[in-house]
């Protein structure tokens, strides 16, 4: 199965040509503009934010998805 160097699987994506379950949604995502927000203030005490890091580690970003063979993202599949 040819992937054309692109693979999408949920929030894990490598390009945009393969595995598009919702092509119209992908179009809207690519045309969305982003804005930067600067927050000035005091950071919370260390004990209050420790759970946030652990929650982020359990997501797909922590698994280091990368394009693999047969139109798959490693470790998740299209």
From Swiss-Prot:
GO BP terms: pollen development; reactive oxygen species metabolic process
Record GO terms (molecular function): metal ion binding
Organs and tissues of expression: Highly expressed in roots. Expressed in leaves, rachis, inflorescences and seeds.
Coiled coil: none
A Pfam family this chain is assigned to: Metallothio_2
UniProt keyword terms in alphabetical order: Metal-binding, Metal-thiolate cluster, Stress response
Lineage top rank: taxon: Eukaryota
Keyword Ribonucleoprotein: no
Task of the protein: Metallothioneins have a high content of cysteine residues that bind various heavy metals. Acts as a reactive oxygen species (ROS) scavenger. Possesses superoxide anion and hydroxyl radical scavenging activities in vitro. Involved in ROS homeostasis during anther and pollen development.
Family note: Belongs to the metallothionein superfamily. Type 15 family.
Additional free-text comment from the UniProt record: Plants silencing MT4C show decreased pollen fertility and increased level of superoxide anion.
Name of the molecule in the record: Metallothionein-like protein 4C
Native source organism of the sequence: Oryza sativa subsp. japonica
Gene: MT4C
């Amino acid at each position: 199965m040819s992937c054309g160097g692109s693979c999408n699987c949920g929030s894990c994506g490598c390009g945009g040509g393969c595995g598009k379950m919702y092509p119209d949604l992908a179009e809207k995502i690519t045309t969305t503009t982003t804005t930067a927000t600067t927050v000035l203030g005091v950071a919370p005490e260390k004990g209050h934010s420790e759970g946030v890091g652990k929650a982020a580690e359990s997501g797909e970003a922590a698994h280091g998805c990368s394009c693999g063979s047969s139109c798959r993202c490693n470790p998740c599949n299209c």
